[in-house]
Amino acid sequence: MTGNRVRYALLLTVGVLAVAPFAAAASAQTIHVVERATTDAVTNGSKQDQAGNVLTWHNKIYDAANKKRIGRDAGYCIRIIVGKSWECSWTTYLEAGSIGVQGQFLDKGDSELAITGGTGAYAGASGTMTLHYRNKKGTAFDFIFHLK
């Protein structure tokens, strides 16, 4: 009987390990939203762009078509390289829960940030978020969350 238990436990373990990659792949999700940057404020320094400046905001979030308001976000960045990049941390709040991100925000071009977790439907979230400028003024951004 002990031999059968060992075989059963081994088969069960192998079965779980074989299915695990498919379960993870099935739970992968992409969420595309738009941030309208209307409250951004740079503080903690002169009016010049300089390392150490702090950017803060609490903006509204819209669906991918930029029509319907579906949430909000709030966060901060610290200027690291003048004219090039910020180091940021923020949370996007949606009806099903929140998603936290952290990483480098570039002054030009797309940025890729790490998803650091979430709440509600996004509890334990990981993956990356692509941030894309919708216009040259920097008043609207696509947030494309690639959840694992």
Predicted regions and their residues:
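Bacterial N-terminal signal peptides that target proteins for export
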Residues: 1-12
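Bacterial N-terminal signal peptides
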Residues: 11-21
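Juxtamembrane cytosolic interface motif at the C-terminal end of transmembrane helices
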Residues: 21-27
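Beta-strand-enriched cores of mature, soluble protein domains
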Residues: 27-148
